[in-house]
């Protein structure tokens, strides 16, 4: 099968600079990387083709040979001898890691494989507002992978140990060559571990870990809110064959409260008052998380008026300064009136009639005046 021109593969001209070649490689490597194209069987081959073109065209000596002899310079028996450029090329993952850093979690470095760290775990915890504000302790049960006790997490039967894999010599990877392609992959003998367990533990069957449900006591600091996350270091799944354990992340969700709404460190609540208290003034009891307090209601208070009670909110988990309680007064209209009460209200209403009526109901008069002007403008 004929091979594509390397310049065509990268989409650059034959006089392209090394910078242009590297830029094209980054774009195409991200486009065709197998991790981003799972299920696309053509992606790995396209990625390898891009990588080979990059390796050749960024090496001055190899590029000169390619410009003069084309693909023949790197074929068996061609320029450069058997094996072509294979002896001088780097790891498939190394070059990708050098160019992209940790975009895909870091390059696949060569060298001895280490046992993998345990996975992190997540637990969703629901709290009442009072628990979140004051702090509390909760016992939780977590299904996890724990280190096997009989073998101390090694995977080998007690009194025995693992041996270095003879296929990869402990590297965990082997290099496969296809023509001028050289690709590293997990060792098929040890499955990338670098070690072989000849006499596995009967409890964990060589894995070094067993399924277990463990109980933890979680201390919730005061002031947490929905979306906060508490990290418990080392309480995730056990690592492979003695590697460090992962972490446990407790995700906090605060349930809705029947009185208070929370916004940051401030609390909000609505308090109903009678229309007589709103008109004449007085005192009303207001609930707080620390008990009841009195709020003075000024004369002629309108419904919806808000009052700020400083320091009666939530003490923040990070700031340690308390927010405020914002109280919204709602003026209630009396219901189920007696005949006498209706008569009194009628007399009260009639007392507003006359030339002074406007001053008693400034909002109503302002609204009616606005409506009149609106319709007057429509008829002009």
UniProtKB/Swiss-Prot annotation:
Q: Which of this chain's residues are annotated to bind Zn(2+) 1?
A: 148, 151, 201, 204
GO molecular function list: ATP binding; heat shock protein binding; unfolded protein binding; zinc ion binding
Source taxon at top rank: Bacteria
Give the main location.
cytoplasm
Q: Which gene encodes it?
A: dnaJ
What InterPro entries does this protein map onto? DnaJ (IPR012724), DnaJ_C (IPR002939), DnaJ_domain (IPR001623), DnaJ_domain_CS (IPR018253), HSP40/DnaJ_pept-bd (IPR008971), HSP_DnaJ_Cys-rich_dom (IPR001305), HSP_DnaJ_Cys-rich_dom_sf (IPR036410), J_dom_sf (IPR036869)
Its biological purpose: Participates actively in the response to hyperosmotic and heat shock by preventing the aggregation of stress-denatured proteins and by disaggregating proteins, also in an autonomous, DnaK-independent fashion. Unfolded proteins bind initially to DnaJ; upon interaction with the DnaJ-bound protein, DnaK hydrolyzes its bound ATP, resulting in the formation of a stable complex. GrpE releases ADP from DnaK; ATP binding to DnaK triggers the release of the substrate protein, thus completing the reaction cycle.
This protein's cofactor list reads: Zn(2+)
**Subunit and partners:** Homodimer.
Q: One GO cellular component term, please give it.
A: cytoplasm
List the transmembrane segments.
none
Q: What is known of its domains?
A: The J domain is necessary and sufficient to stimulate DnaK ATPase activity. Zinc center 1 plays an important role in the autonomous, DnaK-independent chaperone activity of DnaJ. Zinc center 2 is essential for interaction with DnaK and for DnaJ activity.
* ZnF bounds (CR-type): 135-213
Keywords from the named record: Chaperone, Cytoplasm, DNA replication, Metal-binding, Repeat, Stress response, Zinc, Zinc-finger
* Compartment(s) of residence: Cytoplasm
Q: How is the cofactor bound?
A: Binds 2 Zn(2+) ions per monomer.
Q: Which residues are noted in the entry as Zn(2+) 2-binding?
A: 165, 168, 187, 190
In this chain the J domain maps to: 5-70
- Family per similarity comment: Belongs to the DnaJ family.
BP GO annotations: chaperone cofactor-dependent protein refolding; DNA replication; protein refolding; response to heat
What lineage is on file?
Bacteria, Pseudomonadati, Pseudomonadota, Gammaproteobacteria, Vibrionales
Q: What is this protein called?
A: Chaperone protein DnaJ
The CXXCXGXG motif repeats lie at 148-155, 165-172, 187-194, 201-208
